[in-house]
Amino acid sequence: MLVGLALSSCAPSHLPPGEGLHKSAVSHLREAEKTTLPDEQRAVRYLDAARESSALLGSAESGEASRVIYNKAAADLVVLLRSAQNGGMWNRPLTLSQGGSTYRLRFAKGTRDGLWNADQFTSFVPADEVDLKTIKRRNRIDGYGGALVSIRKTDPLEAFSPLVGVTAPVTAVLDFKGNDVTLSLIDPTERTKGRAAGKDRTLDADFSAPLAYYPQHNEMLEGLLGAIRVQQHMNITGLYMLQPYDPQRIPLIFVHGLISTPRMWRNVINEIETDPELRRRYQCWVFAYPTGNPLLYSALRLREELAKVQQRYPDSKDMVLVGHSMGGILSRAQVTTVERDSWDVIGEEKADQFFSKVKPGDLVHRCTNFTANPNVDRAIFICSPHRGSDMAIGTLGSLAIKLISLPVDLVSTAANTVGGSMSMITGDAKRMPTSIDGLSPKNPTVKVLDSCPIEVPHHSIIGDQGKGDTPESSDGVVDY
């Protein structure tokens, strides 16, 4: 019964009963939770609880209950020290005394092999306090140490940081040698073991909580508004890293499709993080953009963001792009070279007319002429309409085009450049092409991209509605 209670949760209200060998440790932990006490007194009580429980780790009689106490004490101590006294108790040697207890606490220095520098993060949240309702399968390992979501949020925000900051899984381990104690913040994606009570032990880790920490909204509504109210959502455009940059890992960049948001990828990323080899080799990024914009304009913005990554992090090589639906077309535009002559596939006379007013370097030129990114090593396309979708020219597509409101400055720039030649793309000399136009099988963009080779190894995941793995199959939107 005791083991069952210990396993149930590490939340404050689910501690093991205060009895038996660990009675004193539970008492220390409950006292440490009293926020009315001075910070130093609370820290000492967390250390008391961790020290007493660590002495029983692995014992047959009380080992599991002691593990729960030790883990919670380690996690909550980190949260306290990082937030107390405006960071005054963080990442410096501390001598802490209360009653008959005295501890000399030091922070382990960060290394490049799985030990975080304490100053890397601005706050912490215990992993068990994060709401995981949007995660289909929790990815965690039961072991030793306090599992935490670490957050790095600066003001102003650093490049490629989400609004809530960059998160990462961290496991806090306290190793006692008499009254001397070392606090280590371990990256469980790099290390599977940490030293506690004089022994290397399997780390407790939660890889799902850092993903679930990011705010969850109504995805369908947010995606729809991003498609039809483009101007109001232009500021979200960008690449975002979901963990601190690691030059040893390959950027795996996810690009969502029409009427969607980067949140669509959370369970895909969670499954990737489940595999020890994948999480060791890859770091996941997402590209966000309002999906109503012209397809080639969104592709340009992705291209510009990738260039910023390369400028800030020159070690970002061998990147892998994963695009769903229209996001696959944006991804393809990063691994394909399109030059002026490429547009002759729609007819030389039409192409000449369209480019007659286009000047090198202007917006339209940058959207329609580009080279494959040499730092992208592979592309994965998921249900991507490389040759367009008939749905874009049907009733639903026509209605969607009418609902989309594009940014005024973007419309003005394009109109002033190509003028009446816009009809070549939209059929209307006065109408700017939307993303829906870009998905039409009749659209010149689709024809041009389809005529240019993909310059990296690539893979396609193709949907099927039961017609078999044949050229006649379809997922209902995109034909084989």
Task: Label the model's feature ranges.
Residues M1-S8:
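Bacterial N-terminal signal peptides
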Residues C10-L252, T261-N267, Q283-V286:
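Flexible, membrane-associating and regulatory peripheral segments of lipid-active enzymes
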Residues S27, E31-L37, Q41-V44, S53-V68, ...:
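Serine-dependent carboxylesterase/thioesterase catalytic core
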Residues Q231-Q232, L242-P247, C367-R378, R431-N443:
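Alpha-helix-centered segments that form part of catalytic cores
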Residues M234-L239, P262, E305-R312, K357-T368, ...:
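A Trp-anchored, charged/polar loop motif used as the substrate-binding/catalytic surface
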Residues L242-Y245, T274-L278, Q310-D315, C367-N373, ...:
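Surface-exposed acidic, glycine-flexible loop patches that form ligand/cofactor-binding
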Residues R266-Y282:
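Short amphipathic alpha-helix adjacent to the substrate-entry channel of hydrolases
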Residues S405, V411-Y480:
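C-terminal subdomain of alpha/beta-hydrolase-fold enzymes, centered on the catalytic histidine
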